[in-house]
Amino acid sequence: RRQASDVYKRQPLILIHGWPGSIVEFLDIIEPLCEPEKFGNKDEICFDVIAPSIPGFAFSGKPANPIGPRKIAEIFNKLMTENLGYERYVAQGGDWGSAISTWLGFDHSKNCKGIHINMLPARHIDGPKTEEEKNWDKQFNIDYISQSGYFAIQSTKPQTLSYAMMESPVGVAAWIV
């Protein structure tokens, strides 16, 4: 947690990383967000930056049970409101952080007043779909199947990948790059 300068209106901002990232990807932007005047920015808004590790990732411990983005959003909302005392905040997320940020905005809109995501989740609001939406779904599924081998292997055979990734930094790089 890094608090903003007292000179400006402070806005709490939770930055949520993805995979294979960690909070390290935010290190270069935290200071400019907290102290914009040091970087020539004269805006009246700056941020209190909170950059937690997703449970089970990087610098965080392993959860007792498997949890998904919606549960993590609940945990992060409690972090922001109950633990840190913010009534309102905004969220930014990429990759898995996008999914978590989306749930923050959806389930916790009383507190999470805005989200910025850089990976758009494909969701449909409940209710009947138009013909255009049905056609989009059909094309999306075709594209998804042909372009998502990465996701399919990670979600169905992660143990297979783990052998290469644990054995060699080159194995990790080959998969990620």
Predicted regions and their residues:
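Conserved alpha/beta-hydrolase
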Residues: 33-59
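A short, charged/proline- and glycine-enriched loop
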Residues: 9-11, 45-46
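The serine-hydrolase catalytic nucleophile loop
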Residues: 19-31
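Glycine-rich, phosphate-binding/catalytic loops in enzymes
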Residues: 29-33, 67-68
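Flexible "cap/lid" subdomain of the alpha/beta-hydrolase fold that forms the substrate-access gate
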Residues: 57, 63-92, 98-99, 103-177
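A contiguous catalytic/ligand-binding core that recognizes phosphate-bearing ligands
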Residues: 7, 20, 43
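Short beta-strand element of the alpha/beta-hydrolase
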Residues: 10-18
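Short, small-residue-biased leader/transition segments that mark boundaries at the very start
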Residues: 2-8
